[in-house]
């Protein structure tokens, strides 16, 4: 019985430790961390907590993306509209500084190639669209978007530099701002200090139909 009690208490300790150990070392290798530009703000320095400690709220997500765009020559940001609840729908364009300076020409070339007015060339950067968290109850996308955007903005790794030289990434950190905000509020106000996987827990039983 004593051994069972010990194992029970140890499991809570390990779960609690796992929640607290959410620094950049948890998400990135030491080599990745070494390559990061210290002039680019990390998510934690802006949102006030490590990524994963709390579900990101949409207002903090937007605040961080705007901070990245202000701090990095690789990123521009635009507001494309508003949601039903008047939250901004934002889109980041992430690419190399050189491509940013020629972004209008790159866009024109892609349109002309699509319309058959220009022969496709291998040196033309690819355009990739990445969107996160279409459903409010699928928050991992928008939470991971914090880390991915930071890495693309801050990394001086050779692979990342080559990627951004050859690619223009259209980056939508939240398809569904209203759903993300609703779920983040519910989960953050009802979660336990220690992780609880019991499906009967209040954290997992929202007052609206799940998913959206």
Model-derived features: positions:
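Active-site/substrate-binding loop(s) of hydrolase catalytic cores
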Residues: 107, 117-131, 139-212
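Bacterial Sec-dependent N-terminal signal peptides
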Residues: 1-23
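Acidic/histidine-rich, surface-exposed loop or edge segments in extracytoplasmic proteins
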Residues: 34-53, 130
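Carboxylate-rich, divalent-cation-coordinating active-site regions
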Residues: 91-123
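Surface-exposed patches in mature extracellular/periplasmic domains of secreted proteins
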Residues: 74-81, 158-163
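Active-site-proximal beta-strand/loop segments in catalytic clefts of secreted hydrolases
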Residues: 80-81, 92-95, 131-134, 172-176
């Amino acid at each position: 019985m004593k051994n069972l009690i010990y194992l029970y208490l140890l499991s809570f300790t390990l779960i609690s430790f796992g929640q607290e150990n959410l620094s950049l070392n948890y998400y990135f290798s030491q080599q990745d961390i070494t390559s990061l530009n210290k002039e680019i703000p990390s998510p934690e320095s802006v949102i006030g907590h490590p990524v994963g400690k709390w579900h990101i709220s949409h207002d903090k997500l937007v605040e961080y993306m705007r901070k990245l765009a202000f701090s990095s020559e690789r990123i521009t940001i635009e507001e494309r509209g508003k949601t039903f609840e008047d939250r901004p729908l934002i889109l980041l364009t992430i690419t190399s500084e050189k491509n940013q300076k020629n972004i209008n020409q790159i866009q024109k070339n892609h349109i002309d190639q699509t319309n058959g007015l220009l022969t496709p060339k291998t040196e033309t950067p690819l355009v990739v669209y990445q969107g996160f968290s279409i459903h409010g109850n699928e928050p991992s996308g928008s939470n991971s978007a914090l880390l991915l955007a930071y890495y693309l903005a801050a990394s001086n790794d050779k692979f990342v530099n080559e990627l951004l030289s050859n690619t223009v990434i259209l980056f939508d950190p939240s398809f569904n701002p209203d759903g993300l905000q609703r779920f983040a509020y519910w989960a953050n106000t009802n979660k336990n200090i220690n992780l609880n996987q019991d499906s009967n827990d209040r954290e997992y039983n929202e007052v609206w139909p799940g998913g959206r």
